[in-house]
Amino acid sequence: MFRSGADDPLSPSCLLRRLSGRRVGADGQKQLVAAVKFWYNGVLGKNLQLDYLYPDRPEFKIPKVFSQQDIKAMLNVCENIKHKAILATIYSCGLRLSELTNLMIKDIDSTQMTVTIRQGKGNRDRVVVLSEKLLLLLRDYFVEYKPKEYLFEGQSGGKYSERSVQQVLKQTLAKAKINKEGSVHTLRHSYATHLIEQGTDIRFVQELLGHKNIKTTLIYTHLTDATKRKIKSPLDNL
């Protein structure tokens, strides 16, 4: 089909030039290499070793978290009860941004003291614990805002926008004078980290976060401040 490897747009050398000459994301690079591997190895039967073309594994980064003092400060400066309820719900339930905006009133079970997160990441439902403090806060919020279907709704009805939630957090961080970079997902990271700090079994944390693979949850077993304080210097044993 091709006269030579140099003319072959699927040759490893051509592929390398394409990857270096364009801004190809890691996922796109994986798909491209997999397709070329299939062509050479599966169709042409050449059995070329192309694994070196896969993107390097990203560096491990410990997720950023807010301290419990940070969380308390945020909630204390929230004068708008809706904003306070939004941030408290994310942190208390370890929610992703989309899970928060998709929460419906029917998902809150004050009898069983549970919150059902429907169709989370990977289209998997899960159930988390409903905090007693959160329930009291939500009841006060209900009295004032009277949502009809979604737990948090926009001014014209329908679910609250993700952008609005992000703006709430940004304004709250500034008001609480917390000079840390953080996003809505940082609240979820904080929830997981604080659970582990208080001794919650990693398997329970995995279930509460909705992680399919325990390896994803294990990133939260990094050395937390609480763990560091328990470590004794060998000098103290002399």
Question: Positions of the model-derived regions?
Answer:
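Conserved catalytic core of the tyrosine transesterase superfamily
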Residues: 1-238
